[in-house]
């Protein structure tokens, strides 16, 4: 994969920097490193004179004007030609309608046969943040409470100001959920189905499809999220998170062809 990336960098006219990490830190570590490198040029020393017009009581709010965005994708994601264009179009629509730059925008993920990858489709936000629930001119887009890193446009200015990165220790799974729920607790984000990417997973399935031994990461990280990131959610959201997690784990257990593996993952994930 590193060789492919370097060959692409050598051939493309797009300025490209290939970064090789010294060890395997999983998807969570890779996204964290990428985000950190992207926001580094925007970082300023903390102080009363460096906060800028984007800061207000209760947090940082990105302002319309010069905007720095970063586009995150999984290594098995292939964007369709207009995927980025549609995300930027949604960003412009959000600014025009709400007077605010969206903190995060997510693409619609489809599988190799054209079916929508429902495991990457977020639910509409129950209690929308300030601004429109939907975007004028983009009727399929809607506000959401979380987004997937399969294809996600993040506002780099907000992240630099918040000094908040994903949690590398998650290694695999739920790092995007933990991070985007933190970003979107007080900020606006939209799911933009007009932006499409192909997510080339080995099998087509929902979030409760049998994950095998990787279910350990699901259990451990969800427990870590419950214990260490409860501030990401309101009280009602915490209750819903717990109920949905129990339901998902129960469906995973019922649908698994090897429940001994699932049971072992539950035991180890619970204790770790």
Across the structure, where does each feature detected by a protein language model lie?
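A short, conserved alpha-helix in the catalytic core of glycosyltransferases
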Residues: 147, 151-163, 169-195
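Short, flexible, basic/aromatic active-site loop/helix in glycosyltransferases
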Residues: 123-145
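Active-site donor/metal-binding and catalytic loop motifs
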Residues: 192-209
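Glycine-rich, basic loop-to-helix element that forms the pyrophosphate-binding segment
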Residues: 21-62
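Non-catalytic, C-terminal membrane-associated alpha-helical segments of glycosyltransferases
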Residues: 213-217, 232-272
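Short aromatic/hydrophobic "clamp" motif used to bind/position activated sugar donors
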Residues: 70
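Conserved donor NDP-sugar-binding/catalytic core segment of glycosyltransferases
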Residues: 80-120
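Acidic donor-binding segment of Leloir-type glycosyltransferases
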Residues: 1-19, 41-44
